[in-house]
Amino acid sequence: MPLDRPSGGRYSLTMVTVGFHASHEQISPAQLLKDVQHAERAGFDAAMCSDHIEPWSARQGHSGFAWSWLGAALATTGLRFGVVTAPGQRYHPAIIAHASATLACMFPGRFWFAPGSGENMNEHITGDPWPAKDLRQRRLEECVDVIRRLHRGEEVTHRGLVTVEQARIWDVPDSPPPLIAPAISVDTARRAAAWADGLVTVNQPAPKLRDMLAAYRDGGGKGKAVLQVHLSWAGSEQEAAAIALDQWRTNTFAPPIPWDLPSAGHFDGIGEHVGEEQVRGAVNVAASLNAHAEWLSDYVELGFDELYLHFVGQQQDAFIDAFAAEVLPQVRTADPASTEPQLAAATASPASDAPA
């Protein structure tokens, strides 16, 4: 299979991209590779994942290494891929620069990554203290500068919140991979406008998403607006709700909780008494495919260019086939409009499965 994606895709460049979210925390790496191949065959346009060492719950039970998996996924599909990751503690920024440059060299134009300030559940393994959010944000910005310089082929020495001594990457891509800013708050989106090549967030109440997009754009933010959408679908409303409650109830808490807890066990502890109503605040739950299509179309109207669909269940086949046949065609006909979208207001600001 050629490494470059064939030019001239199936869909217009002006049409919204609808991608598949590959949830390493919930599905084994081998099965997830099959799932993303299935998603491509069914008609999804792209894929993304998050770089975790710890799942959000023991019930999820997985957490393969995203960077190893990405090489296999890029080599065995023609999709474009992105990954949310966190340089600065678990990873030295030169390692992220090296890994991302190598993928971009082998698969030009098909890889982006979203460097975030991190989550303690992944970063605590170093044994280093967990910094406050503002310090993590400044550390991230140093890492972004280091990574960009390394991608340009420079030899980098840097001493600050991270230390780099005479680092150089010998194989650099002709076009460096875009660095997309992950954010779940208005303040983070505004701050990211200074450095990011785009913005990625998760489904939240429409006013919050609108404010985030405005903060990013008003601050001079460039590039695409990307939305990861947590959803649950099944043959009945009851089953769809049960799937979401089982798999995603630990992801219903607003920051700083998702940033600061250290393990799946801690998340399971605070999620013990979460009910269906709270889960519905973080996950779009419906048995109706038309309802999901309407939600997704509303996100397009808000101004998002790319949607990555995360079915929160662990068995992906039925979701992939049903959404490819019934939902994706409806979403692709949606146009950004000045009319107010009819997104239902969520009851909680959901936790991201991405560093922010």
Residues of each region from the PLM?
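Active-site-adjacent structural elements that line small-molecule/cofactor binding pockets in enzymes
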Residues: P2-A356
